[in-house]
Amino acid sequence: MYNHKVVEKKWQDYWAKHDTFKTGTDPKKKNYYALDMFPFPSGKGLHVGHPEGYTATDIVSRMKRAQGYNVLHPMGWDAFGLPTEQYALKTGEDPAVVTKNNIANFKRQLNKLGFSYDWDREITTSDPNYYKWTQWVFEQMYKKGLAYEAEVPVNWSPDLGTVVANEEVIDGKTERGGYPVYRRNMRQWMLKMTAYADRLLEDLDDLDWPEPVKEMQRNWIGRSVGAQVTFKIKDSDKTFDIFTTRPDTLFGCSYTVLAPENKLVQEITTDGHRDEVNAYIKKIESKSDLERTDLNKDKTGVFTGAYAINPVNGKEVPIWISDYVLASYGTGAVMAVPAHDDRDYAFAKKFDLPINQVLEGGDLSKAAFTEDGPHINSEFLNGLNIKDAKKKMVDWLEEHNCGEKKVNYKLRDWDFSRQRYWGEPIPVIHWEDGTTSLVPEDQLPLRLPHATDIKPSGTPESPLANLTDWVNVVDEMGRKGKRETNTMPNWAGSSWYYLRYVDPHNDKELADYDLLKQWLPVDLYIGGAEHAVRHLLYARFWHKVLYDLGVVPTKEPFQRLYNQGLILKNHEKMSKSKGNVVNPDEVIDEYGADSLRMYEMFMGPLDASIDWDDNGPASTKKFLDRVWRLFVNDLDLKAIPQERIVDKNDGELDKVYAETVKKVTEDFDALHFNTAISQMMVFINAAQKAKTIPREYVEGFVKLLAPVAPHMMEEIWQVFGHDESITYAKWPTYDPAKLVESTVEIMVQVNGKLRGKFEAAKDADRDDVQKQAMALPHVQKFLEGKDVKKVIVVPNKIVNIVAK
C-alpha cells in the first residue's frame, strides 16, 4: 500500500537537503521565469483556493526544468499593510512578530504541498534590506519630479484611520473591511502616474494577457480625445475651461456645471443663491467619487445665479453646480447639451432647463438623440456629420483663441501616503525653513522604528508622529526638521518584487542589470483577476519609470499573464466569516498533497470559478493508487511487477502513448491541465488492458505525471532504479508516425447492404483486401449460389460486392 504521509515527507526533506530547485545558471540553456502573485501572509493561513494558481506555475516550472531550461520559480511575502496592522491593533501584538509567525505558517503549508520554489530567493517586503530599495525607487521618482506633495481631495476612511487610493475604493467603500469613504482635502504624497498614461495604454497591445484585464486597464486609464473650451463669466473678467469629447455640439449648450469644490463657485455665486449653494456643498462633501458618478442615479444640483457666455454664439447660459462633476477629472467643469447627452437630458428635464437640438434625428420629447446625423441650428456646422463637425469646430475655437484640441484621461496620479504605522517610511525630511530633502541614499534604509502604540491618530499624521525621538532631526548646521510621518501603501513593495527575486542578496543595487536582462520579462505570471487595476497597473508604472532610469532592460514586466478562477464553497467565495473555508492541511493529511494538487487541476479549466467538492481529492487519490498498483509490486514496494512491465515493445500502446506525450506537453504549455490529466487517465486505462507495458512508456508516463503528483512519481522513479531525482530527467518525446493508425477497419457490403467488417493493414494491396473480404464467413453466406459480377474496393474504407 502506498503511504502518502511517509513518501511525501521523505521527498520534501530530500528536495530541501539537495537544493533540488535551486535556479539554474547554465549559460547554454534557455531561461524560464514562472511567477506567482506572492501572498499576503495573513493569520488564517492558506485555504484550498490559494494552491490552485501555485500548482499551475509549479507544473509548468517542473516541465520546463525537464525540458532543459534554467527555471526561476521563487516565492516571497507581501508583508506590509492594513490587515496585519488591524490584527495587531486588535490583539495588542507587534505587527513584526505577527508577520514573522504568519510567514512561518504559510511556508510550512506551501512546503507540504510540494511546490518547487527556490527558497534561497525568498523576499519579504517588510524586511529593511528589501524596503531599502523600495525607498530608493521613491527617491529616484522624487528626483525626476514624479513624486510630489500636494493638497488634494482624498478618500478618507475614519474607520481605518487612513486615506485609500481610488483603486482601493469599491462601490464607495474600502476594499479592506468595506468601510465608508469620505472626501476631504489633505496634504499627500502623489506619484505622477498620469505622466505615463499613453505608454501604459499603448504597450498593452504587446502583452499576452487576458483581454478583459487589458480592457479594464484601458477603461481605468480612460483616454478620450476632445476639446478644451474657454467660457467667459458674464459681468466678470473671470473664465473657466471645460473639456468635452463633443465640441461639435457647442451650439446646443444650454447650461454649464461646475464641481462644487471648484474655487470659482464661491466667487461667482450671487447673494440670492449663496445659502442654497453652501447647503448643497455641505450635503455632498462626504460622498466618494464613485457615489457621485457611477452609483449616482438621481442627479442633484443648484443654480449659482451666475451666467457664462457661450463662445461660439455669445448666448448666456446658467452656471449650476452638481456633485456628478468632479474637481479631479478634466477641468472640474462641463458644458451641458441635453439634446444629445443622456445625463444632461435627465438633469435638464429635472430642473426644467432648455433643450436645444443641434443634430437631426430622434424624438427629444422622449429622450436625447445620441447617434450621428447632420448638424442643424449650428451655423457653419450645418449639414456636417459628427466627425467632420468636430474637426471644423476645433479649428474655429483655435482660430478664435477660445479653445483647442485636447486629450484627457480618467487616470489620476497615485495617492501614495498612508496615515498608518505598518508600511515603508517615506524617506523625506521637512525642514523648519520650509524646504524638503531626501534622506541621503547611503543612509537607506530608513528603518521603521519600533512602536508600542500604533493606533491611528485620526489625523493626517500616522502613529509615527508620536515617536518624537525618531521624527525630530537636526542637520550639521543646526537646522531643525521633522521626518515625514506618512508611510507608503502596501502596493509599493509589490510594485517591483519580481525584480528582486532575480538578484535578492545584492546590497549595491536593486538588481544586477545583466541578470535582469537574462530573466526579464517574466514568462508566466499567474494570479487573481482582482488585481487588474491596482497591482498590475502600479507594477507596470514602476517598471516603466525604472526602464527610463536604465535600471531594467524591458519596457514591460510580465509578458504572459493568466488569471486563475476562484475555488468556491457552496457557490460562495471562501471566507472565515462565512465559515466555508476548506483547510488544505486537513485534505493533505487525509488524501496527500499529490491528490489535492491533482484534484485542483482536474476540477475544470484553470480560469473558471468552480465549486469545491469534498469528495474530489478522494477520487484523484483513487486514480493515483491505480497508477501505483500498476507500476509497483504491492507485496514488495521496492520492486516492479516484472511480468507486466517489460523491455520489449509489442506496439499495442504505441498510439495512445504518442497521443499522451503530445497532448500533455501541449496542454501543460496552454495551461489546460484538466484535459492533460484526462489524457493521462486514457493512457492508464489502455495500459491496464494491455498484456504488457514497455518499460520505456512507463518511465515516460511517470515523467509526464511528475509535475502534477511529484511525490509519488519520485518514489516510482526510485523503484525503477534511478538514483537521481526525477526533476531533471529528460522530458519525454514521441514519434509522430505512431500517431497514425497502422490498421484500418474495412466495411464489406453485398449488394449495397453491410454484411461484415474486418481489420486490414493501412494502404494494403487491393487484391489482399478483396481476398480478406470474400473470405469472411458472414459474407460467404450471402454469396452462396450467386455469381460475383463486380467487386469495388475503396482503399482503407469499403469493399462493395455485386452478386447475382
Swiss-Prot record:
GO terms for biological process: leucyl-tRNA aminoacylation. Signal peptide: none annotated. The keyword ATP-binding applies. One of its GO terms (molecular function) is aminoacyl-tRNA deacylase activity. Pfam families: Anticodon_1, tRNA-synt_1, tRNA-synt_1_2, tRNA-synt_1g. A motif ('HIGH' region) lies at residues 39-50. It comes from the Bacteria. Keywords: Aminoacyl-tRNA synthetase, ATP-binding, Cytoplasm, Ligase, Nucleotide-binding, Protein biosynthesis. ATP binds at K576. Its main location: cytoplasm. It catalyses: tRNA(Leu) + L-leucine + ATP = L-leucyl-tRNA(Leu) + AMP + diphosphate. It is found in: Cytoplasm. One of its GO terms (cellular component) is cytosol. A motif ('KMSKS' region) lies at residues 573-577. HAMAP family: Leu_tRNA_synth_B. This is Leucine--tRNA ligase.
